[in-house]
Amino acid sequence: MAGVKAGLYLQSSVSALRGVGPALVSRLQHMDLWRVQDVLFHLPSRYQDRRHIASMATLQAGQERAILGEIVRVDHQRGGREQWLVTVSDGSGCLQIRLFHMALALRAQWQVGRRLWCFGELRGGFHGLEMIHPEWQMADVPQFQAPHHLTPFYPSSEGITQAQWRRWIAHALTLLDQLPDYLENRLPPQWPGLREGLRLLHESADEIPSPQHPAWQRLALEELLANHLAVRRMRQSGMMQNAPCLRSKGQMWQRFLAHLPFSPTMAQERVIAEINADLARHRPMRRLLQGDVGSGKTLVAAAATLTALEAGYQVAMMAPTEILAEQLHARFQQWLEPLGLEVGYLVGSRSPRVRRETAEALAGGRLSLVIGTQSLFQEGVAFACLGLVIIDEQHRFGVEQRRQLLEKGAMPHLLVMTATPIPRTLAMTVHADLEVSVIDALPPGRTPVETLVMPDSRRPELIGRMQHMLEAGRQIYWVCPLIEESEILELQAAEASVADLQAALPGVAVGLIHGRMRSAEKAEVMAAFQSGAVRILVATTVIEVGVDVPGASLMIIEHAERLGLAQLHQLRGRVGRGAQRSSCILLYHPPLSGKARERLRVMRETYDGFSIARKDLELRGPGEYLGTRQAGILQMRVANILRDEALLAMVPALAERLLQEDPEAVQAIVQRWLGNRVDYGQVG
């Protein structure tokens, strides 16, 4: 193969590999393996050491061993399930090989006197130790080769065997010399080059390579770099656009503060200043605002909104659910209507006439502020001069949804907010398209919620505690989490809890809110709870974000072992919003798994959202932690964002150097690792 042709061959379809026909091409593509080069970067998940031949005299049940010996007996048993029992000896002892379903062509090979190599797991049989269907080769033929390196095992699905993987990768490795190393002389000198590292990981002859091995680290760093560069490319494409300059004298903000019964915290003032500086520029703001539950992100959003409105531009604020959108709308009405500002509301449950009138007011410029759900970026909704988009609970939306809403304006500024904090090193990769601001202090008067963990068997004791709190005029949340992703079972569990509470606490008004209710029904129940007419609110996790009822000071979460740390922390944040001391009780049903026990321990001992987020990331891993929408391009083949945190710290400086010195390498690295998963023209 000529060099240039081989180099191009790495970019060819996997169909170029020996033995890969149309059916296998489809299976490989389902695993996101499209090119020969992709197969090279499909790394082993584990290894077996088959290089050493074990003496049969030393074998023990439960071991995995390679043996080499002579076939001394072959028994063909036809009674019941047809099988072959082959006895092999190496002079020190004997071993029986048990085989089923042997093809005719293979049966002829199993002859007394032939030499046989086998690898498999040993187990006790009727006649001593045996292997059932081991991997084997006849050792008395010229083509026999005993393994001279560790045997790799590859992640697999779609019915692809390990033998197929090893054959394809051996083929791809013949092209390794044509693989360019774009990071040569830019990495620690003790690390191998790209080609050397790949060969070592596929054909390791010494130690079993762990994720801490320099070869693994070399590839993990390049993958992290590719993801960082891809998201950064999106950001840079947005920075080249002109955005409206939203300068204001702060007159609306000062009038707003005059009506506010409290003052912003220093952390809020710092973040507001960062946002206002962004808004005053002619390039589009792309900023992520992270803040713990109850840290005051909504007030910061109000400050940004007033800056945009005073500058003469429209503002759109999007929430992931109607119940949260309704809460935001009510809050902004309370804050802004005294200033003479109308707050629009656009959600799917509103009547077609109201939605049409709201859309017409936005298009005509008669309405400057609208709060809603995904309805905001549907067809038929246009803005006269959209200057600022605010997205609450950012982790619920993907890049595509953000982009659709941004397209409603010429190039509006973007502020995304989340109470699900992401550790800084992770944010540098996940949100390389966004500047990050953090509200790192709670408003004065907010005290940590006392958190107790108790088994469900102590429910009678809990009812007594609830009775005492109700007599003191308090309100209570009772949360029933989703059961097996079934809304019907969820509803049944919630209704059963309502019946139990009504029986245990006669005369107490108990409300119910669940996922199968219409938005108007949910809003009615929430209004009754906020007014105090409903004393206990039984709910599913639909109340986990944004709901604000200062009179609620006790949160009880049933089956707390089913929920993740982020959900538990979000739910706990619904109490402790008034002046009184608040509590959260986590009810669990034993036995607990190790991870569930650890989650409940963290909740009992920790109130800091960033510490909880870090632990959540450790327990769940980056993919599950971020979710499919938010993870986006972070479907890592080699790297692990948590494990490779030290590598993440190296990425920004390396990316900066590459962008300045070798822009072509940037494109090639991103293409190598992400293929067609990134649309470089998109703005994050």
UniProtKB/Swiss-Prot annotation:
<dbReference type="InterPro" id="IPR011545">
    <property type="entry name" value="DEAD/DEAH_box_helicase_dom"/>
</dbReference>
<keyword id="KW-0227">DNA damage</keyword>
<dbReference type="GO" id="GO:0003678">
    <property type="term" value="F:DNA helicase activity"/>
</dbReference>
<keyword id="KW-0067">ATP-binding</keyword>
<dbReference type="Pfam" id="PF19833">
    <property type="entry name" value="RecG_dom3_C"/>
</dbReference>
<dbReference type="Pfam" id="PF00270">
    <property type="entry name" value="DEAD"/>
</dbReference>
<keyword id="KW-0238">DNA-binding</keyword>
<dbReference type="GO" id="GO:0005524">
    <property type="term" value="F:ATP binding"/>
</dbReference>
<comment type="similarity">
    <text>Belongs to the helicase family. RecG subfamily.</text>
</comment>
<dbReference type="GO" id="GO:0016887">
    <property type="term" value="F:ATP hydrolysis activity"/>
</dbReference>
<comment type="subunit">
    <text>Monomer.</text>
</comment>
<dbReference type="InterPro" id="IPR014001">
    <property type="entry name" value="Helicase_ATP-bd"/>
</dbReference>
<dbReference type="Pfam" id="PF00271">
    <property type="entry name" value="Helicase_C"/>
</dbReference>
<dbReference type="InterPro" id="IPR001650">
    <property type="entry name" value="Helicase_C-like"/>
</dbReference>
<dbReference type="GO" id="GO:0006310">
    <property type="term" value="P:DNA recombination"/>
</dbReference>
<protein>
    <recommendedName>
        <fullName>ATP-dependent DNA helicase RecG</fullName>
        <ecNumber>5.6.2.4</ecNumber>
    </recommendedName>
</protein>
<feature type="binding site">
    <location>
        <begin position="291"/>
        <end position="298"/>
    </location>
    <ligand>
        <name>ATP</name>
    </ligand>
</feature>
<dbReference type="GO" id="GO:0006281">
    <property type="term" value="P:DNA repair"/>
</dbReference>
<feature type="short sequence motif" description="DEAH box">
    <location>
        <begin position="392"/>
        <end position="395"/>
    </location>
</feature>
<keyword id="KW-0378">Hydrolase</keyword>
<keyword id="KW-0547">Nucleotide-binding</keyword>
<keyword id="KW-0413">Isomerase</keyword>
<dbReference type="InterPro" id="IPR045562">
    <property type="entry name" value="RecG_dom3_C"/>
</dbReference>
<dbReference type="InterPro" id="IPR027417">
    <property type="entry name" value="P-loop_NTPase"/>
</dbReference>
<comment type="function">
    <text>Plays a critical role in recombination and DNA repair. Helps process Holliday junction intermediates to mature products by catalyzing branch migration. Has replication fork regression activity, unwinds stalled or blocked replication forks to make a HJ that can be resolved. Has a DNA unwinding activity characteristic of a DNA helicase with 3'-5' polarity.</text>
</comment>
<dbReference type="InterPro" id="IPR047112">
    <property type="entry name" value="RecG/Mfd"/>
</dbReference>
<dbReference type="InterPro" id="IPR004609">
    <property type="entry name" value="ATP-dep_DNA_helicase_RecG"/>
</dbReference>
<feature type="domain" description="Helicase ATP-binding">
    <location>
        <begin position="278"/>
        <end position="439"/>
    </location>
</feature>
<dbReference type="InterPro" id="IPR012340">
    <property type="entry name" value="NA-bd_OB-fold"/>
</dbReference>
<feature type="region of interest" description="Wedge domain">
    <location>
        <begin position="51"/>
        <end position="148"/>
    </location>
</feature>
<dbReference type="GO" id="GO:0003677">
    <property type="term" value="F:DNA binding"/>
</dbReference>
<keyword id="KW-0347">Helicase</keyword>
<keyword id="KW-0234">DNA repair</keyword>
<dbReference type="InterPro" id="IPR033454">
    <property type="entry name" value="RecG_wedge"/>
</dbReference>
<keyword id="KW-0233">DNA recombination</keyword>
<dbReference type="Pfam" id="PF17191">
    <property type="entry name" value="RecG_wedge"/>
</dbReference>
